[in-house]
Swiss-Prot record:
Pfam families: NusB. One of its GO terms (cellular component) is cytosol. Involved in transcription antitermination. Required for transcription of ribosomal RNA (rRNA) genes. Binds specifically to the boxA antiterminator sequence of the ribosomal RNA (rrn) operons. GO terms for biological process: DNA-templated transcription termination; transcription antitermination. CDD domains: Terminator_NusB. It comes from the Bacteria. This is Transcription antitermination protein NusB. Gene3D superfamilies: NusB-like. One of its GO terms (molecular function) is RNA binding. Belongs to the NusB family. Keywords: RNA-binding, Transcription, Transcription antitermination, Transcription regulation. InterPro entries: NusB-like_sf, NusB_fam, NusB_RsmB_TIM44. It comes from Teredinibacter turnerae (strain ATCC 39867 / T7901). The lineage of its organism: Bacteria, Pseudomonadati, Pseudomonadota, Gammaproteobacteria, Cellvibrionales.
Length: 147
């Protein structure tokens, strides 16, 4: 399948849902991933990207959390809405590991998912936190875009 912006967006959509499910029930990754492939039409999804995001977040959860934790304004991780937490982890993974994807694209995709699935106004919180994470992880790209 040809990788497009749309297939990547769908991959992020399903990966965020898979991460959410993993956070909530702790089922093995392969079980959750198999359910997604069985229960959803994945024909228009970049399934390799879905797999990379889902497994990458699970494998690097603590390091990802450490990237955005300083920007939560003293809010403990446990108090975050689970959808917001899944989005922050997924987007931070992309910012950290997929430098081929512009940071603005990563943030915009996360904000759009927060508008669709998150609590009211969570998209503003997600945008603010990820903007700071991008400044930390992608300083050159971030500063070049700001000048």
């Amino acid at each position: 399948m040809k990788v497009t912006a749309a297939t990547r967006s769908r991959a992020r959509h399903f990966a965020m849902q898979a991460i959410y499910q993993w956070q909530m029930n702790g089922n093995p990754l392969h079980v959750i991933e198999a359910e997604f492939h069985t229960d959803n039409d994945m024909s228009k999804v970049d399934t390799e990207y879905f797999h990379e995001l889902f497994h990458g977040v699970a494998a690097d959860k603590s390091a990802l959390d450490a990237c955005f934790l300083p920007h939560l304004k003293s809010l403990p991780l446990e108090k975050l809405d689970p959808v917001t937490l899944a989005l922050l982890r997924q987007a931070t993974f992309e910012l950290k590991n997929r430098v081929d994807v512009p940071y603005k694209v990563v943030i915009n995709e996360a904000v759009n998912l927060a508008k669709k699935f998150g609590a009211e106004d969570s998209h503003k919180f997600v945008n603010g936190v990820l903007d700071k994470v991008a400044a930390d992880l992608r300083a050159l790209e971030f500063n070049a875009a700001r000048s």
